[in-house]
Amino acid sequence: MKVNKKRLAEIFNVDPRTIERWQSQGLPCASKGSKGIESVFDTAMAIQWYAQRETDIENEKLRKELDDLRAAAESDLQPGTIDYERYRLTKAQADAQELKNAREDGVVLETELFTFILQRVAQEISGILVRVPLTLQRKYPDISPSHLDVVKTEIAKASNVAAKAGENVGGWIDDFRRAEGS
């Protein structure tokens, strides 16, 4: 929905001057105004920008708190003390937020989702491969049955590998981590 500055201020329950300040901080504008012409904002883009801004501010607060706790010297923190527990909680919150941001940005993908996608792709590939011998036979009627059998055998092997792809993801992840660590 496209709105002017006054309406956007009402949506966020802030003063229109706050919207102007946000513009200087990067609030996206659907069309910039000029003398006598109002600026127009896309509410979806504005809400997304605001949410990201708030997330960044919260992350910065958590990082600062974490740095303050580290400055207090991690070695001074004794398990069971309130400072130690606060440090653990803050660190866990910061890590969780960074992981959430990475997931939202598409940098991190859950293994279950990746496995599901890989299995779907493998099924589609297998479906195409199974039709290859019939396509060859129709396109080249003179092809010998022994040649078709060889093609069918190789396609069956490839289809079996594709079918097991979802089962192999865990092992492949371990292989990747070992290779990445070396």
Swiss-Prot record:
One of its GO terms (molecular function) is DNA binding. ATP binds at S31, K32, G33, S34, K35, G36. GO terms for cellular component: host cell cytoplasm. Its main location: host cell. It is found in: Host cytoplasm. SUPFAM superfamilies: Putative DNA-binding domain. Keywords: ATP-binding, Coiled coil, DNA-binding, Host cytoplasm, Nucleotide-binding, Viral genome packaging, Viral release from host cell. Pfam families: Phage_Nu1 (PF07471). Residues 51-105 form a coiled coil. InterPro entries: DNA-bd_dom_put_sf, Phage_lambda_Nu1_terminase-ssu, WH-like_DNA-bd_sf. The keyword Kinase does not apply. Heterotrimer of two small and one large terminase subunits. The active complex may be composed of five heterotrimers. Component of the terminase that processes and encapsidates viral genomes during virion assembly. The terminase is composed of two small and one large subunits. To initiate packaging, it binds a specific sequence, at the junction of adjacent viral genomes in the concatemeric DNA substrate. Next, in a reaction stimulated by the presence of proheads and ATP but not requiring ATP hydrolysis, the terminase creates two nicks at a specific site, one on each stand. Terminase then separates the cohesive ends in a reaction requiring ATP hydrolysis. Belongs to the terminase small subunit family. This is Terminase, small subunit. It comes from Enterobacteria phage P21. The lineage of its organism: Viruses, Duplodnaviria, Heunggongvirae, Uroviricota, Caudoviricetes. The gene is 1.
